[in-house]
UniProtKB/Swiss-Prot annotation:
A family per Pfam: Flagellin_C
Disulphides: none
Protein family per UniProt: Belongs to the bacterial flagellin family.
Gene name of the record: flaF
Subunit structure: Heteromer of multiple flagellin subunits including FlaA, FlaB/D, FlaC, FlaE and FlaF.
Molecular function as annotated in GO: structural molecule activity
Any one Gene Ontology cellular component term annotated for this protein: bacterial-type flagellum
Cell location: Secreted; Bacterial flagellum
Lineage: Bacteria, Pseudomonadati, Pseudomonadota, Gammaproteobacteria, Vibrionales
Protein name: Polar flagellin F
Keyword Coiled coil assigned: yes
Record keywords: Bacterial flagellum, Coiled coil, Secreted
Length: 377
């Protein structure tokens, strides 16, 4: 091997290894101190991109979980108010049944009506004041709202909260009354016992309710028979002996058309639209009609509560799934991004030894040109 003065190849090689060991040592110390295997793109460009996408998705999942929890809170608030609405309407129904009893005087019915009116006011107060974060929930202002329960676009669920005001369409229905009064001797005639009720449902389809009454039945028995044949309408008799028919507003897109011999005899005609807000239980007929109206209203409220309960369960399952996805993504990101301390500590010790060895060898290599002096001496 040649002995040179201008170029110390051994020193250059030792210096290169020393620089490499120092760089690797610095990288190990950076990874150990930060806890991350990838601290810049130069460490692992592809891994950095994947890790960033995973972190973005996890962040979105965290927001989605909060959104779903907010949705559950809104539905719990609304459902709690609806529970009280049901309790109040049940009390109003009890009062209506009490008023329909013949043992009550007009004074007593008037007193019962006063409580019904007060309860109606409370129902509307609940509908107007129930809110979440400033948003009214039960007066119709909430309408349909989307809840983003996923980490990507298009993963939203629409929830609709309908009005619980007592003057709403769903809180009542159409009332019909016979123009003719049935006295105590009135009976269904054998050859004039057919009653057909035709109406258009919410789907735009024509429906018919065919009643073939039993001949010999009086007006009260006729009402009972109609109620036993269909759940689409409710029949009752007022204090004047007139047949009353009630159909829920949400079941029809229009009014009922009556036909048949029995319908002609009774002279069925539209009385008007009755809702919870205009109940009048000061008469037997009004009290009977109030029961039908309240049954319709409670059925509507119960259906809304059932829907909210279903959505709450759905959101809970969505949260469970989001948490599971987040857990798996976090594990994947950890494998890509996080430092393996056992491996990196070993690497650091290795580079420290190499650094020390390279430093020693470099010091010795720097003495090699001095051999030329011995040749000159």
């Amino acid at each position: 091997m040649a002995i040179t003065v201008n170029t110390n190849v051994a020193a250059l090689v030792a210096q290169r290894h020393l620089t490499s060991a120092t760089d690797m040592l610095n990288q190990s110390m950076e990874r150990l101190s930060s806890g991350k295997r990838i601290n810049s793109a130069k460490d692992d460009a592809a891994g950095l991109q994947i890790s960033n996408r995973l972190q973005s998705q996890m962040s979105g999942l965290d927001v989605a979980v909060r959104n779903a929890n907010d949705g559950i809170s809104i539905m719990q608030t609304a459902e709690g108010a609806m529970n009280e609405v049901t309790n109040i309407m049940q009390r109003m129904r009890d009062l209506s049944l009490q008023s329909a009893n013949g043992s009550n005087s007009q004074v007593e019915r008037t007193a019962l009506q006063e409580e019904v009116t007060a309860l109606n006011d409370e129902l509307n107060r609940i509908a107007e004041t129930t809110s979440f974060g400033g948003r009214k929930l039960l007066n119709g202002a909430f309408g349909k709202s989307s809840f983003q329960i996923g980490a990507a676009s298009g993963e939203a669920v629409q929830i609709e909260l309908k009005s619980m005001r007592t003057d709403g369409l769903e809180m009542g229905g159409f009332s019909y009354v016979a123009q003719g009064r049935a006295d105590s001797d009135w009976q269904v005639k054998e050859n004039a016992n057919d009653l057909t009720m035709s109406f258009i449902n919410r789907s735009g389809e024509t429906e018919k309710i065919q009643i073939n009454a039993k001949s010999g039945d009086d007006i009260e028995e006729l009402a009972t028979y109609i109620n036993g044949q269909t759940d689409k309408v409710t029949a009752s008799v007022n204090e004047k002996g007139q047949l009353q028919i009630f159909m829920a507003g949400e079941d029809t897109a229009g009014t009922i058309s009556f036909s048949g011999d029995l319908a002609s005899e009774l002279g069925m005609s539209l009385k008007g639209y009755d809702a919870v807000n205009n109940l009048n239980i000061t008469t037997v007929g009004g009290a009977q009609q109030a029961v039908a109206v309240l049954d319709t209203a409670m059925k509507f409220v119960d259906s809304q509560r059932a829907e909210l309960g279903a959505y709450q369960n759905r959101f809970n399952h969505a949260i469970n799934n989001l948490d599971n996805i987040h857990e798996n993504l976090a594990a994947s990101n950890s494998r890509i991004q996080d430092t393996d301390y056992a491996k990196e500590t070993t690497q650091m010790v290795k580079q420290q030894i190499l650094q020390q060895v390279s430093t020693t060898i470099l010091a010795q290599a720097k003495q090699a040109p001095n051999l030329a002096l011995t040749l000159l001496g």
